[in-house]
């Protein structure tokens, strides 16, 4: 997600988080991308190992904490600008990012937990999709969502 979509996503994260924080609701703003275009160390390792079939993800993940739940918005507002930094955001491996966010959220002590995902569409990583099925990342995302819905009381919302 880059350009106008990430600008809108940043606003969608910023405005509600400030409002909720004023109501003493803890909010965490997380982001995700890949470290490289078209693979990285994961793809190099796969290639060095003889390119076995069905390798799974072939790009390196970058998970970003723009605002931690226990950090006040004023202390992290500059971090939100990182979303707009040219060159930071690359490809999207949504399922693993949602697993990461889920693992963070289940550790929280709050009684009610809501995860809102703002997306520009389907997960995309050319390196992974070039050697796995074309719907590999989308299937993983759907399995991840089903797992969260079936195995936790976290409310999952999605835009995009």
Predicted regions and their residues:
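Acidic, glycine-rich A-domain
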Residues: 1-160
């Amino acid at each position: 997600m880059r350009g106008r979509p990430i600008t809108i996503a940043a606003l969608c994260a910023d405005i509600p988080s400030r409002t909720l924080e004023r109501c003493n609701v803890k909010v965490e703003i997380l982001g995700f991308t890949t470290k490289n275009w078209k693979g990285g160390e994961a793809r190099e390792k796969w290639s060095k190992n003889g390119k076995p079939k069905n390798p799974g993800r072939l790009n390196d993940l970058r998970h970003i904490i723009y605002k931690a739940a226990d950090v006040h918005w004023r202390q992290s507002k500059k971090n939100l600008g990182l979303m707009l930094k040219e060159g930071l955001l690359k490809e999207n491996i949504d399922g693993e990012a949602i697993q990461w966010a889920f693992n963070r959220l289940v550790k929280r002590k709050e009684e009610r937990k809501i995860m809102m995902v703002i997306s520009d569409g389907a997960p995309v990583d050319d390196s992974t999709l070039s050697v796995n099925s074309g719907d590999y990342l989308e299937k993983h995302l759907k399995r991840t969502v089903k797992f969260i819905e079936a195995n936790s009381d976290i409310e999952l919302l999605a835009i995009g």
